[in-house]
Design a protein with these regions (language model features):
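Rossmann-like NAD(P)-binding element
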Residues: 51-114
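Glycine-rich Rossmann-fold phosphate-binding loop(s) that bind the pyrophosphate
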Residues: 9-10
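C-terminal substrate-binding/catalytic lobe of Rossmann-fold NAD(P)-dependent dehydrogenases
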Residues: 134-140, 149-313
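Extreme N-terminal starter segment of soluble prokaryotic enzymes
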Residues: 1-4
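Conserved N-terminal Rossmann-fold NAD(P) cofactor-binding segment
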Residues: 34-72, 302-309
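N-terminal Rossmann-fold NAD(P) dinucleotide-binding loop
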Residues: 13-14
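Rossmann-like NAD(P)(H) cofactor-binding subdomain of soluble oxidoreductases
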Residues: 88-154
Length: 313
């Protein structure tokens, strides 16, 4: 029997739980939220699609009773507040750090061997906090951001090439932010051939730019942050763990010398399986890409340093 807990029943969390159920990633999904009745309602709504969608996964909604999350193989953390008007970045980090730290303490109390997938923002910083505040081995804390950013890259590539998104491949490394992510065009292909054979440098640059502002574009259109792709991206990471897929997924991982970096969590290509991050792939990237990665590193370190300034770590 496999079990996944999703903490936070908002748009991203509920979408994630729905994708997990429809794809029958686990036998049981526990959706938990602090708001009375909210997770129960979302879970009931999902379960009422079971016959329509043909899945057998059981989704249970819970209000703030972490004992019901016991025995989870994977815990996906989506809880946290969005940045409100007038709120400084430091204030946002302080609030969300407190939420994430409290949640992690609770889930590990009942599922001490769970692998944690962090979605809460700022994602690289929250993954770093989770790892160091709890003293977990680095394979058990995974930041979801690269999976989402890479999905967006593939979407914009498919639009430029006028092809199916499943015919293109590519991924994004670096921080999960519109100025810190690095779409690796040198590893981007269409049916196994580098996309530079099909797109002009200008067209490829437009794909890169669209990817980097992908989240902001959706916020402008929707009036709020996106949730469909983020929820599905988190579910895809959980699926790779539960099904031991040994799948290459770009994720925010703790580095111990890879790419010349230590004491940081940042997006890099990882092999994801039953043990979480089973391997970090150190690719032969160009000097330009490496320089961009170190620029991203500096930005991520600056944000992560706020945790120590606030005495959270």
């Amino acid at each position: 029997m496999s079990k996944v807990t999703v903490v936070g029943a908002g748009n991203v969390g509920a979408t994630c739980a729905n994708v997990l159920a429809v794809n029958e990633v686990a036998n049981e999904v526990c959706l938990i939220d602090i708001k009375e009745g909210f997770a129960e309602g979302k879970a009931m709504d999902i379960m009422q699609t079971a016959q329509l969608m043909g899945f057998d996964t059981v989704v249970e909604g819970v209000t703030n009773d972490y004992s019901r999350t016991a025995g989870s193989d994977v815990v996906i953390i989506t809880s946290g507040l969005p940045r409100k008007p007038g709120m400084t970045r430091e204030e946002l980090i302080g609030v969300n750090a407190g939420i994430v730290k409290s949640v992690c303490d609770q889930v590990l109390k009942y599922s001490p061997n769970a692998i944690l997938v962090v979605v809460s923002n700022p994602m690289d910083t929250m993954a770093y906090l989770t790892l160091h505040a709890l003293g977990l081995p680095r394979n058990r804390v995974i930041g979801m951001g690269g999976a989402l950013d890479s999905a967006r890259l593939k979407y914009f590539l498919s639009q430029a090439l006028k092809c199916n998104a499943n015919d293109v491949d590519g991924f994004v490394i670096g921080g999960h932010g519109d100025t810190t992510m690095i779409p690796l065009t040198s590893y981007t292909t269409y049916k196994g051939i580098n996309v530079s054979e099909f797109l002009s440098p200008e067209e490829l640059e437009n794909v890169v730019k669209s990817t980097m502002v992908g989240g902001a574009t959706l916020t402008g259109l929707l009036g709020t942050s996106a949730w469909m792709a983020p929820g599905a991206a988190a579910a895809s990471v959980a699926e790779a763990i539960i099904k031991d897929q040994k799948k290459m997924i770009p994720c925010s991982a703790a580095l111990e010398g890879e790419y010349g970096m230590k004491d940081i969590t940042i997006g890099v290509p990882c092999i994801i399986g039953k043990n979480g991050i089973e391997k970090i792939l150190e690719l032969n990237i160009s000097e330009e890409e490496r320089a961009k990665l170190h620029e991203s590193e500096a930005a991520v370190r600056k944000t992560t340093a706020i945790l120590k300034e606030l005495n959270v770590l």
